[in-house]
């Protein structure tokens, strides 16, 4: 019984969330929420593009919140800011970034997941991350290392986050990408990273 209660407490503090990518992009917003609910999840991730799809259905913010409330679900993850290290960011990327900030405010989400496909030096990337963190203000910027990206592993990810030296710059540790980057299973890669700098630990089916 004690373990069950502890599990429920942990689940309440950190809702079990299904990624926006897992649910795909070819369904209506309410169908997405229902599918996640029926599968036993407590929260859904939402990409900026998926949020725009919901608006394109004719939904307003109040409608989206009503659907979530109707099914006892929450949006618990917002993503995905990219190309934030470009010297001259496009208006589309600037708008998407602002949209992610709005989504965090709307859904009371504290963190935005971010990736970077382009490969730059640690120093340059850290400077651009610092600028992103300043724009994000109160929101956490979760940097996600991916083996096919410009931040391919936790080693470079931590070097960038450490050099950026921002309180709201943190790392996402995704076991799916971890395995595909051939990182050691003994976790030696993260032994020098403070625990409070790893903001998410994600596993995938």
Set out the residue ranges of the language-model regions.
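N-terminal pre-domain/capping segments
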Residues: 2-109, 166-170, 196
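Active-site acidic/histidine proton-transfer and metal-coordination neighborhood
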Residues: 30, 67-74, 84-173, 179-180
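Conserved small/polar residues in nucleotide/adenosyl-binding loops
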Residues: 205
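Short, conserved loop/helix-junction motifs that constitute active-site signature segments
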Residues: 190-197
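Short gly/ser/thr-rich secondary-structure transition/capping motifs
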Residues: 24-26, 179-184
């Amino acid at each position: 019984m004690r373990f069950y209660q502890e599990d429920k407490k942990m689940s309440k503090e950190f809702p079990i969330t299904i990624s926006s990518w897992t649910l795909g992009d070819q369904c209506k917003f309410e169908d997405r929420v229902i599918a996640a609910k029926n599968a036993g999840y407590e929260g859904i991730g939402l990409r900026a593009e998926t949020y725009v799809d919901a608006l394109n259905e004719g939904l307003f913010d109040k409608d989206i919140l009503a659907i979530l409330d109707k099914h006892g679900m929450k949006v618990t993850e917002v993503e995905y800011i990219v190309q934030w290290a470009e010297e001259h960011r496009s208006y589309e990327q600037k708008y998407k970034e602002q949209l992610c900030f709005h989504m965090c405010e709307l859904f009371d989400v504290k963190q935005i997941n971010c990736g970077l496909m382009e490969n730059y030096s640690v120093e340059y990337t850290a400077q651009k991350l610092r600028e992103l963190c300043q724009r994000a203000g109160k929101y956490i910027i979760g940097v996600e290392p991916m083996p096919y990206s410009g931040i391919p592993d936790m080693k470079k990810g931590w070097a960038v986050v450490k050099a950026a030296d921002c309180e709201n710059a943190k790392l996402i540790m995704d076991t799916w990408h971890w395995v595909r980057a051939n990182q050691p299973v003994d976790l030696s890669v993260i032994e020098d990273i403070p625990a409070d700098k790893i903001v998410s630990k994600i596993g995938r089916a």
